[in-house]
């Protein structure tokens, strides 16, 4: 998740921030990324934030949240093919990257979903490929480290269907064969959500044993690119996301991992924006804790897709314009409210919890541009402000 445009306002003096390791001082402003990053992956180890891949190719960067004045530091390049939408999480002081999608080789005719896994060691500043394969496609999935050292993974596109669709699309010249191209797209995009066979298991990877397991099935429709926030040890909030290409859900679910199993509970949906604009849900939103609340910001959707799906038109986003949202919501554990606005519509960037707010890193704007900007959404439970 990641972005912002326009002139940076200078902070007067130096703001005091209390991070998990104690009180630290923020620089005059949060440093921009060296390059714009969208559809990338991110993780955090202590006070080090890591962001890369996606539109940055194999680039990988780190920011010391205790000393942001040092800026983003280039780390070792990712050693796999450039990938979008990888699931990434930290465990045992290392960072693990699973799946994603991209071209296996530069001359490949079409992208695929990868079934590979890699680990980054900050101590040696090096990547290694793991001797394992993901059980299913995990592009668009969310990964999170658990207290026992394992990594839980939610959602993910179906590799078999995704790979075949993109190969078939790549084999047709849509200018010379427009009818065949349209028929293929309509056939794939017109399926009901269940037909996409997205990952409906809560997978768990154990770095110590280099093996995979399951924490149980998701009782809801599996989704991809949801917003995710850690609520407490073993407690995670999954908000919105896609339930099929082009169609989001406004639902939010609380997942509690206890005694080797994932326990799901539906909580309040994202609220309607107004009486005339129903909640479409969002994919690629930014999320994290801000004090006692969870903030969910930005994301992208297609206005009108929910109405189309309700009418049985399952190619729900056909002919609709994609919208990059600037809405920010706050969740107090029971109810949602509209907290304010981002400086602009943004999606598919990175977010990190910070005292007093949510650090928003990069992302994609309404023009599809990968953004460099980094800013803090400050929230005191009543008012939202932006610290650049």
Swiss-Prot record:
Keywords: Carbohydrate metabolism, Isomerase, Kelch repeat, Periplasm, Repeat, Signal
Assembly notes: Homodimer.
GO molecular function: racemase and epimerase activity, acting on carbohydrates and derivatives
Known function: Converts alpha-N-acetylneuranimic acid (Neu5Ac) to the beta-anomer, accelerating the equilibrium between the alpha- and beta-anomers. Probably facilitates sialidase-negative bacteria to compete successfully for limited amounts of extracellular Neu5Ac, which is likely taken up in the beta-anomer. In addition, the rapid removal of sialic acid from solution might be advantageous to the bacterium to damp down host responses.
GO CC annotation, single: periplasmic space
NCBIfam families named in the record: muta_rot_YjhT, PRK14131.1
EC number: 5.1.3.24
InterPro entries cross-referenced by the UniProt entry: Kelch-typ_b-propeller (IPR015915), NANM (IPR056734), NanM_proteobact (IPR019936)
Swiss-Prot/TrEMBL Kelch repeat ranges: 48-92, 94-147, 149-186, 187-232, 236-285, 307-356, 358-387
Organism: Brucella ovis (strain ATCC 25840 / 63/290 / NCTC 10512)
Family according to the record: Belongs to the NanM family.
Reactions catalysed according to its record: N-acetyl-alpha-neuraminate = N-acetyl-beta-neuraminate
Signal peptide (UniProt feature, chain positions): 1-26
Intrachain S-S bonds: none
Protein location: Periplasm
UniProt keyword Repeat present: yes
Active site (record annotation): 242
Coiled coil: none
Principal localisation: periplasm
Protein name per UniProt: N-acetylneuraminate epimerase
